[in-house]
Regions:
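Short, structured surface patches at the beginning of a domain
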Residues: 1-128
Length: 129
């Protein structure tokens, strides 16, 4: 199956270091090898919050407009918002490299956890100021 890879990091620093992006590439590469996926294009958003809808991000919009299923390393790289994930599940095909066989129920549960983590990150950031 031909797929496109989508990578996202929240800060410019993560993008400049390459560490977050490289880890995502490795997850997707491994999953592609295991499941016979062929990555035909790659899209990358750097310095973009997981709270922004994927279709409103420069590279995210292009990835989903490509027409191939989109693969992300982890669900929180796609979004940290339950509504975003639920909407994408209805309209687009995507896979998560770290849980390629996850069903709709499991994806919803992980989306709730990702959204909760976004709130925790925000609280920790505010407390540190």
């Amino acid at each position: 199956m031909e797929v496109v890879a989508y990578y996202r990091v929240s800060t410019k620093g993560q993008g400049e270091s390459g560490l977050g992006l490289e880890a995502q590439r490795e997850y997707i590469k491994f999953a592609a090898e295991q499941h016979g996926w062929v990555v035909v294009a790659e899209f990358e958003d750097v310095g973009v919050s997981g709270g922004i809808h994927p279709l409103e991000r420069p590279a995210g919009a292009k990835a989903f407009a490509d027409g191939h299923p989109v693969v992300v390393a982890k669900l929180d790289r796609l979004s940290r918002d339950v509504e975003h994930i639920a909407g994408l599940m209805k309209r687009h095909e995507f896979r998560v490299a770290t849980m390629p066989t996850a069903d709709a129920f499991q994806l919803h549960i992980y989306a709730v956890l990702a959204e909760q983590e976004r709130r925790f990150i925000s609280e920790r950031t505010k407390a540190a100021l």
